[in-house]
């Protein structure tokens, strides 16, 4: 009993669970219900992220579709950032901050508030890692938005954006950057970001097949 109690009161366990719960806040679902009376989990792809929200609202001729989708994207991004910020604020070890980041991503994709359904997690991924690897993630964000703006294919932009940040972690740590944002100095491995990228690919398997077949839908 004491072992269980010690486990449940362990600061690292508490913040990992907190990261999961924060990441699990379904902003897309909540805002679509509040403002439009729609259950976004039962429409389109069933995802609660900005892409499915945008497609759903545009298909119904809603004039502020882009603004609502952008709001949801920002909220999903900032919840990941907030979870990691809290872990930094309370002085958690850098490797455990990565655990909190991963927990927030899993929370978004498998929300405890939606029977463990959710979105594909890209906004939350970018938000959660920006305080951990700011150089790599900010460049990844720019690539994500650029590809999305030019090609208007959300899934491709997501994969390329997260992929860019992942590739950069094999180069940026060897530059003259502060140890506090150097994944190799703090963790000793690039594994956390590589796992996140693999998870991104898994969540986009259907989209990848559609891309290869030339059937992936564009976001207008």
Swiss-Prot record:
Topology relative to the membrane: Multi-pass membrane protein
GO molecular function, one term: acyl-phosphate glycerol-3-phosphate acyltransferase activity
Gene Ontology cellular component annotations, sorted alphabetically: plasma membrane
Catalytic activity: an acyl phosphate + sn-glycerol 3-phosphate = a 1-acyl-sn-glycero-3-phosphate + phosphate
Transmembrane segments: 11-31, 70-90, 96-116, 127-147, 153-173, 193-213
Entry EC number(s): 2.3.1.275
Keyword Oxidoreductase: no
GO BP annotations listed: phospholipid biosynthetic process
Keyword Transferase: yes
Protein location: Cell inner membrane
Keywords associated with the record: Cell inner membrane, Cell membrane, Lipid biosynthesis, Lipid metabolism, Membrane, Phospholipid biosynthesis, Phospholipid metabolism, Transferase, Transmembrane, Transmembrane helix
InterPro entries registered for this protein in UniProt: G3P_acylTferase_PlsY
Biological or metabolic pathway of the protein: Lipid metabolism; phospholipid metabolism
Highest taxon, organism lineage: Bacteria
Subunit text: Probably interacts with PlsX.
Purpose of the protein: Catalyzes the transfer of an acyl group from acyl-phosphate (acyl-PO(4)) to glycerol-3-phosphate (G3P) to form lysophosphatidic acid (LPA). This enzyme utilizes acyl-phosphate as fatty acyl donor, but not acyl-CoA or acyl-ACP.
NCBIfam families noted in UniProt: glycerol-3-phosphate 1-O-acyltransferase PlsY (TIGR00023)
Family: Belongs to the PlsY family.
Protein's name in the database: Glycerol-3-phosphate acyltransferase
Species of the source: Helicobacter acinonychis (strain Sheeba)
Biological classification of the source: Bacteria, Pseudomonadati, Campylobacterota, Epsilonproteobacteria, Campylobacterales
Gene name for this UniProt entry: plsY
């Amino acid at each position: 009993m004491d072992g269980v109690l010690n486990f449940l009161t362990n600061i690292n366990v508490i913040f990992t669970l907190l990261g999961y719960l924060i990441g699990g806040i379904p902003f897309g679902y909540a805002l679509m219900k509040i403002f439009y009376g729609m259950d976004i989990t039962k429409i389109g792809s069933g995802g609660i992220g900005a892409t499915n929200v945008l497609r759903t609202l545009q298909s119904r001729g809603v004039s502020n579709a882009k603004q609502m989708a952008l709001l949801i994207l920002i909220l999903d991004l900032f919840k990941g950032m907030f979870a990691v910020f809290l872990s930094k604020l309370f002085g958690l070890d850098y490797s455990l901050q990565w655990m909190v980041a991963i927990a927030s991503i899993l929370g978004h994709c498998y929300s405890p508030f939606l029977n463990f359904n959710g979105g594909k997690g890209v906004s939350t991924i970018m938000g959660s890692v920006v305080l951990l690897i700011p150089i790599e993630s900010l460049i990844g964000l720019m690539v994500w938005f650029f590809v999305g703006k030019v090609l208007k294919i959300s899934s491709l932009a997501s994969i390329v954006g997260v992929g860019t940040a992942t590739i950069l972690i094999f180069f940026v740590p060897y530059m003259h950057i502060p140890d506090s944002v150097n994944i190799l100095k703090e963790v000793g491995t690039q594994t956390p970001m590589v796992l996140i990228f693999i998870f991104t690919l898994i969540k986009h398997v259907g989209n990848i097949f559609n891309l290869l077949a030339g059937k992936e839908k564009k976001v207008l």
